[in-house]
């Protein structure tokens, strides 16, 4: 089995004296795990960080066995964010969520492009937390658990959508949801439209929505909690006054 594809590094852990086991999110083939030789070298370390974009060349004797990969860097990778610890926290959370949520060897191009869009936005402090929420919503969509924010689940109304049902992931209008206000999730306007501006509390509301459904539909069935890096991101955004 051999292939070549663009990929993002999701994680890398030391294996032996000089190698590493690397999780990759590829553009066309989904998540793959591979052994990378020489990973301890000074040349290799920068593009084995989470979020680094590479050309991966993969080879395995048997299709059901873990193979070996060589990696060639594309661009400068996450090193440009080393002076932005909050953005690095966002990148770490995104890589951890993708690594934990995506099955191996199953194509998920939507997840690849959602991560690509987030990484491009991380250099813009004013917008990336909202783009992170959209990344998680896109991941849910690609896994078959997409939110339906197009109309009110109760009335079919297209207007004044301000809640999400925590059971179904469908939008609910203000009028229909008011009697159940305490049982519904607040829906921030930016999740409905790219033109929706951000006000205080919007990012927290968005992360609460995507976190709820990631837990309910993805991680709980796998008997796993949300990744610690994702929990820490919420804490750090709060400390920075960015929620």
Curated annotation (Swiss-Prot):
Carries keyword DNA repair?
Answer: yes
Does the record's keyword annotation contain Electron transport?
no
According to its record, what are the GO cellular component terms? bacterial nucleoid
Q: Which domain of life is it from?
A: Bacteria
UniProt entry keywords in alphabetical sequence:
DNA damage, DNA recombination, DNA repair
Q: Which family does it belong to?
A: Belongs to the RecO family.
Described by its record, this protein's role is as follows: Involved in DNA repair and RecF pathway recombination.
**Record PANTHER family:** DNA REPAIR PROTEIN RECO
Annotated protein name in UniProt: DNA repair protein RecO
Organism for this UniProt entry: Caulobacter sp. (strain K31)
Lineage, top ranks: Bacteria, Pseudomonadati, Pseudomonadota, Alphaproteobacteria, Caulobacterales
